[in-house]
UniProtKB/Swiss-Prot annotation:
Transmembrane segments: none annotated. The gene is aspS. This is Aspartate--tRNA(Asp/Asn) ligase. GO terms for cellular component: cytoplasm. Its EC number is 6.1.1.23. It holds the Pfam family tRNA_anti-codon. It is found in: Cytoplasm.
């Protein structure tokens, strides 16, 4: 458990004068009062030892055999019973010192014991932390939270939140709470709807994010806003995403440019990493990589920069190639991407079969490769390649004997993503340093993309981002060449947040939406309150909202987001402990003017 401060007047009451984790040799012969949970209890031939646990740690209690009444009380105790004791601190003999405990040099000889609550047998042990099903852990989460690792995770999360608040307040940010009941926004993920009793047939929505409120705060004259905000989205669970509810550090700043926000966030992350963990940041300031560049080099806009592999574009090599499949692709405007694995050219056939299976899972028709072996070239496309093509390839990719190069072809983005998926797959061959945090910014996202299914131009990402070049760019450039002031922050392949410099100009907003096929009336109908606010004096502004849950996951080396949330739902968006969601009474539904139309059971 995490150590806390020692005795203080604030904690001196009838239950305790000290915390378990604060006891040490300096308190020898002092009388103390302690309270907590029975972690373990052992009878050693007349001596009873109790490991007492509170939120700061564990200390050992001793009940002497001559203390008949205490001995009798202890004989009826179960693990996780709650007790309060009085006793004297004594030094342990040298051979019994427990170096694993902060209080391991002492023990407390008990003179009085009160059983506040005797626990019945537990559904799973706390002390031994044996493997336990997630269903059982979530049903009895209050017991699971007593376990050392998850207990420390929750305390650590609290400290991260406090450190964030201090850091931002020192830089003139103001913490402001925004509404939990708001209007529905069907353009995003599915909303959680809340029926209104006072307005029959109408619904509130729980906010997916405080996006519009924080922008309105900029209009209201609060130039630096933040809150650790609850957000609600009716979406499926993943290992790094909790269904239903999550928390984000919501931030917005007025009169800034992109680099101003980067400086604030980079400084905050560096402060958190250096002050709260043993991890280290690879590069500071964080590298900036354009969307086009990150896709070409890593095949994803969420790259794990610890993986020592980069993708190469070899399209020109195949324009007139004897390998007709790739040559035909290049003539259709497609790209050919390559990935080199140094020293892996002699792997077994099983290695290549597994790699091809993964490539097909990523959407590729197959996986072409060439092995550069001592005895010559091997691979499914070698026979189609001329000596000149091989020589050019070796020169461009710095290939040597013992290497292997893999290829993927297709439309630019598809080829990039297939090879990016293979880069991540092959990344498992390397031992990545879990104490290294490789942050980067992804910038210069495209403003628009072509929706082939709809046959029209759509917004690529956030429609409220300011286009680079503003109105002039919208009027003069090919929409598919336009870039937005939008950015993502990524760490070790995990996207922590997206953000943007906002479009605060109604004239630019109308034109940006017009290019995507929206009329002025459409924009006013959907976003009229924002447009109206911007017409009444809106400063340039931008923001970001890193996920608190994911940040704590990274700092604590957790693979599952439920390990850093006190009361998470399961994968099916159920709270097993509170039995939510649950049915409600007919009277409750009638009061809300709701009639159920449930799907028929199979």
């Amino acid at each position: 458990m995490t150590n806390a401060a020692g005795s203080s007047s604030a904690l001196q009451n009838r239950f305790r004068t000290h915390y378990c984790g604060s006891l040490g040799p300096v308190l020898q012969q002092e009388k103390v009062s302690l309270a907590g949970w029975v972690h373990r209890i052992r009878d050693h031939g007349g001596l009873v030892f109790i490991d007492l646990r509170d939120h700061t740690g564990i200390c050992q209690l001793v009940i002497q055999p001559e203390e008949k009444e205490l001995f009798e009380q202890a004989s009826h105790l179960h693990a996780e019973s709650v007790i309060a004791i009085e006793g004297s601190v004594v030094l342990r003999s040298p051979e019994t010192v427990n170096a694993r405990l902060a209080s391991g040099a002492i023990e407390v000889v008990v003179s009085a014991l009160t059983v506040e609550s005797n626990a019945r047998p537990l559904p799973f042990p706390v002390a031994d932390e044996l493997p336990t099903s997630e269903e059982l852990r979530l049903k009895y989460r209050f017991i699971d939270l007593r376990r050392e690792k998850i207990h420390e995770n929750i305390i650590f999360r609290s400290r991260v939140s406090s450190a964030i608040r201090r850091y931002l307040e020192e830089r003139d940010f103001v913490e402001i709470q925004t509404p939990i009941l708001t209007s529905s926004s069907p353009e995003g993920a599915r909303d959680f709807l809340v029926p209104s009793r006072l307005h029959p047939g109408k619904f509130y929505a729980l906010p997916q994010a405080p996006q519009q409120f924080k922008q309105l705060l900029m209009v209201a004259g609060f130039p630096r806003y933040f809150q650790i905000a609850p957000c609600f989205r009716d979406e499926d669970a993943r290992a790094d995403r909790s269904p239903g509810e999550f928390y984000q550090l919501d931030m917005e700043m007025a009169f800034i440019e992109q680099d101003d926000l980067f400086e604030i966030l980079e400084g905050m992350f560096r402060h958190l990493v250096t002050s709260m963990s043993k991890k280290r940041i690879t590069a500071f300031p964080f590298p900036r990589i354009s969307y086009r560049d990150v896709m070409n080099r890593f095949g994803t806009d969420k790259p794990d920069l610890r993986i020592p592999l980069e993708i190469a574009d070899v399209t020109p090599l195949f324009v007139n190639s004897g390998f007709k499949v790739f040559a035909a692709n290049t003539k259709e405007g497609c790209a050919v991407k390559a990935l080199v694995l140094k020293g892996r050219g002699t792997e077994s056939r099983l290695f290549y079969d597994k790699a091809e299976k993964r490539a097909k899972e990523l959407g590729s028709a197959g996986l072409a490769y060439i092995q550069f072996r001592e005895e010559g070239l091997k691979g499914p496309i070698v026979k189609f390649m001329s000596e000149g093509e091989i020589a050019s390839m070796k020169e461009q990719l710095s290939l040597e004997t013992g290497d292997v190069v893999f290829f993927a072809a297709g439309k630019w983005e598809a080829a990039c993503r297939i090879m990016g998926g293979m880069r991540t797959y092959f990344g498992e061959l390397f031992t990545l340093d879990h104490d290294e945090l490789s942050f980067c910014w992804i910038v210069d996202f495209p403003m628009y993309e072509y929706n082939e299914e709809a046959g029209k131009i759509d917004f690529s990402h956030n429609p409220f981002s300011m286009p680079q070049g503003e109105m002039e760019a919208l009027e003069t450039m090919d929409p598919l060449e336009l870039l937005a002031y939008q950015y993502d922050i990524v760490c070790n392949g995990i996207e922590l947040s997206s953000g943007a410099i906002r479009n605060h100009r109604p004239d630019i907003m109308y034109r940006a939406f017009e290019i995507a096929g929206y009329s002025k009336e459409d924009v006013d109908l959907r976003f009229g309150h924002m447009i109206e606010a911007f017409k009444l004096g809106a400063p340039p502004h931008g923001g970001i909202a890193p996920g608190l849950d994911r940040l704590v996951m990274i700092l604590r080396d957790e693979q599952n987001i439920r390990e850093v949330i006190a009361f998470p739902m399961n994968q099916q968006a159920e709270d097993l402990m509170m039995s939510a969601p649950s049915e409600v009474t007919t009277a409750q539904l009638r009061e809300l003017h709701i009639k159920l139309d449930l799907p028929k059971e199979d």
